[in-house]
Amino acid sequence: MSIQPLHPVGLKSQAVNFQLMPPLSLYIHIPWCVRKCPYCDFNSHEAKPVLSLSKGGSLPEKEYVAALLRDLESALPRVWGRRVQSVFFGGGTPSLVSGEGIAEILRQVRMLLPLEHNAEITLEANPGTVEADKFAAFRAAGVNRLSLGIQSFNDQHLRALGRIHSAGEAKRAIAIAQQHFDNLNLDLMYALPQQTLEQALQDVQTALEYSPQHLSCYHLTLEPNTLFAHQPPLLPDDDASSAMQQGIEALLAGQGYAHYETSAFARPKKQSRHNLNYWQFGDYLGIGAGAHSKLSFHDKVIRQARYKQPQAYLDAAVQGMPVQSEQVLSKEDIAFEFMMNALRLNNGFEEVLFQERTSLPLLLIRHELDEAEKRGLLQRDGQRIAPTELGQRFLNDLLQIFLAPEH
């Protein structure tokens, strides 16, 4: 599907004029990992040998932390005075960084930005790169939410995914994490190579034995420019993967997890605040190699991208010039991107949120909304707009309504 912004009648005559700035989050990218997974299309680069610098490893932690902080300093004029509600360390594998490195980053973040006192601070970790003392150090540094990339508890499937950890290591990592964190997310994947419905449900059942506060269950997709795209494995067909999805949703609903976004399930009040800000079209400042930003001003919305290659980023960041590209979003882009994000939420969004986050009147997409409702993909009650169950199942078809015709 070619994604183009929508072009509703009258949109071009509307001016962007924000009266209230959206909530702001901070994303920090750590680009290194132990081994690139064959399905991964994120900006990640293998670091060999993977040891901490104190043990003679190759990860340039000290230099990268300095570059991140210089990056943040250079971005301050764009976010001056705005409070940060969440911080997210993503990758790559952020848990490759030492506890001291994470602590230094967060120390400087607190000095440079007004961080909310109850800010959600998440760090992604892989079971194969964690030790008990590291978890304790991350918690002491100020991280209050851990996201573990489990993917599966089946050793055969872990090998097929190119993961470096075993099922036993995954279980050990969860047990250690729960000694230090009371807000834990587990990432799982389904529709894996040669996976059966029973195996997919068993992965979720095993995760439930630990009662995590949050579960993310992702359908494996073959992304361009990945090893799996070039050498596709044998995957379950559409009917089988759909049965897995429905079975997972039913199992988690029965255990009290709210299915609040396409792939996200949470205990009450344990939704990912950081990701919710993305889906509700909030602002985010991204620092680090390849990080993206979306920032609103009174008269415009901009997107930025940092240099992707770690060395290019390091060289540019220390000079205070980490941004490789920047664009001002058109009003068409703003309206479309809001819908593309907000319609991922199962409960949708309040109508007033559209104008708050885009500065555009909802009236401008009334024809698209009418069409989606007529096709049974969308429901409205005068206050809230949300995808129907059919719209959730066929989200791409729903989004297609808000895309411009291809030329």
Features from the language model and the residues they span:
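Flexible, acidic/Gly-rich N-terminal and inter-domain linker regions that tether
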Residues: 1-24, 34
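C-terminal scaffold of the Radical SAM
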Residues: 18-25, 42-78, 82-360
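Conserved N-terminal Rossmann-fold NAD(P)-binding element of oxidoreductases
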Residues: 28
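Local cysteine-cluster metal-coordination motifs and their immediate loop/turn environment
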Residues: 31-44
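Short amphipathic alpha-helical interaction segments
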Residues: 359-371
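A short, conserved structural fragment
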Residues: 374-383
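Minor-groove-contacting beta-hairpin "wing" of winged helix-turn-helix DNA-binding domains
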Residues: 384-388
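Short, amphipathic alpha-helical interaction segments positioned at domain boundaries
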Residues: 390-407
